[in-house]
Structures are given as C-alpha cells and as structure tokens.
Amino acid sequence: MTDSDDTTCKRYIKMITNIVILSLIICISLAFWIMSMTASTYYGNFRPVSPWRWLFSVVVPVVIACNGFKKKSLDHSGALGGLVVGFILTIANFSFFTSLMTFFLSSSKLTKWRGNIKKQLDSEYKEGGQRNWVQVFCNGAVPTELALLYMIENGPGEMPIDFSKQHTASWMCLSLLAALASSAGDTWASEVAPVLSKSSPRLITTWEKVPVGTNGGVTAVGLASSLLGGTFVGLAYFLTQLVFVNDLDISAPQWPIIAFGGVAGLFGSLVDSFLGATMQFSGLDERTGLVVSSPTQETKHIAGKPILDNNAVNLFSSVLVALLLPTAASGFWPRE
C-alpha cells in the first residue's frame, strides 16, 4: 500500500468514525427526549424538553470537551468531567451554558497566553492548563448542583431574573452566575497579573510585599482583571437573555446581570485570596527561587498554613460567593 492509499484509508476511517459518533449522539438525544415525553405524560407538572434542545445539549459539550482535550486545556478525566458539567448546564438553561463557555474558553486562552513567562514563575505550570476532574469538580460542582435544583424548581428553559415574580429561581440563576463569575475572576487575575503587573504583590492579610505566585498576593492589575473576568461572564449571560427570553418587556430590567457578574468576579477573587493567604501554604524554594505550596526543609515559609490546597480554596470560594451575593443582590435588584 502506497503512502497516498494509506492517507486515503485513514481519512475514510476518520469519516466513518465521525458518522458513527454523530449517529450515537442523535440516538442518545432521542432517547432522552422519549424519556422526557414519557415523564411529562405521567407527571403533569414536568415540562417536556424538545428534541433539538436534547441534541444541542449533547453535541455541543462533546465537541467542546474533545476540543479542550485536543488543545491540552483538559486531560482525560477533565474532559469527561467537563462533559457532564456542560451537559447539565446546557439542558437547564442556555444562559448557564454561555456563561460556562465564556469562563472556560477565556480562561483556557489566558492560561496559554505568555506561557513561557509563567513557566519561569510557577513551579506547577502545565502547558495549556491540562485541568483534571478535580479542578473541573471544584469549579463546576456548585454550578452543576444549582442547575439541577433550577430544573427541579423551574424546569429546563430560560427565564428573566425577577425576584418579585420568581424569587427562588432568580436566586438560583444569580447564584450560579456568581459561582462562574467568581471562578473566572480568580483565573483571570492569576493568569494576567503575573505577566502585566509591574509592582510586587501584597499579601491581602498584612499588606506586606510577597514574591510573585504567593497564595493570597494581590495587585491592582489582578483585581482589575478579576473585575473584567466576572463582567465578561455576566455580559454573556445578559446577551443570552436578550436572545432567548420572550417576556423581557414585562419583567424586571436584566442589565444589572452585567454589573453583578463584575462584582462576583472581584469579590470571588478577594475571598480566594484571603483563604489562600490564611489556609494555603506558600513558601520560597531556596534552590529554584520559586514559590511552592508544599513545606519542605529547603522551603522558607511566606504565608498560610497547609490546611487547604488550591482546588479546595477554589471550591470554598465558589460556595461562599454563590451563597452570599445572590442574597445581597435580591434586596437591591430592580423591580418591574
């Protein structure tokens, strides 16, 4: 067999594989649709989901997870975890989906941005990020749980955020947005500040100057980045509302969603920094000159105690922001 024949054979195999995968996805989507129709028949309060929504909710997360794995943004376990999170958020509400995608895609791009510089500053730097299932869980567990609760409360579909008409469902929507905006704000700050900031970070608890990479260290550039990251996620949610929600003219204004996203990004970054400064170990490895998160005999302590790792800090930050901010926002949210 010549090289040309071998290449043609590989193309045919790839094409057939894609057709088989697409056929399986369509079958899975139809099976989900049949189950939802059956549930709607026997349980009158259950609203059936259209087959197109099922198809979109299966196909798009699969494509994005595969693309993330191919570009090293996710490893095997991270791709599988992201697939589950993406499916649940997409089937629940397209505004949830666009917020998640905005967070994931922007964070992946920023992680790769100026990677050669970050490699010199971060002892745990991985090319592309290569997030595993633990990182996906710590950033996606809270939004996933809220999306499930939202479907139980309201059913799948988009709705305006209006506390005067649907208080519980609106609270859940803002809580989910807060969790994603918080994660985006923290990621934007940690990826942008080490590269662009010209001043040394200051520890959030004592305001002392600390080396770049210290957990709990903040800079003006980092805080501005976290505000922008959260705002970007909030903007994605808002624009999706404009496209998919029909009764916006008789609902409360939706523009505060953008500002809420920015506040969540900034507040989440501050909470993450405080937890990192107090409950996460930071030390200077005297051999390499890099900040490390594990205490050893050759490590000089900078701040924090070895209670939580970075993933646990992200999870706790997400939980706190998701609980506190929607409750505060409900008192200030404009009414119709």
From Swiss-Prot:
It comes from Mus musculus (Mouse). It is found in: Membrane. Coiled coil: none annotated. Keywords: Membrane, Transmembrane, Transmembrane helix. It is a multi-pass membrane protein. GO terms for cellular component: membrane. Its main location: membrane. Signal peptide: none annotated. This is Transmembrane protein 19. The chain crosses the membrane at residues 15-35, 49-69, 78-98, 218-238, 257-277, 313-333. It holds the Pfam family DUF92. Belongs to the TMEM19 family.
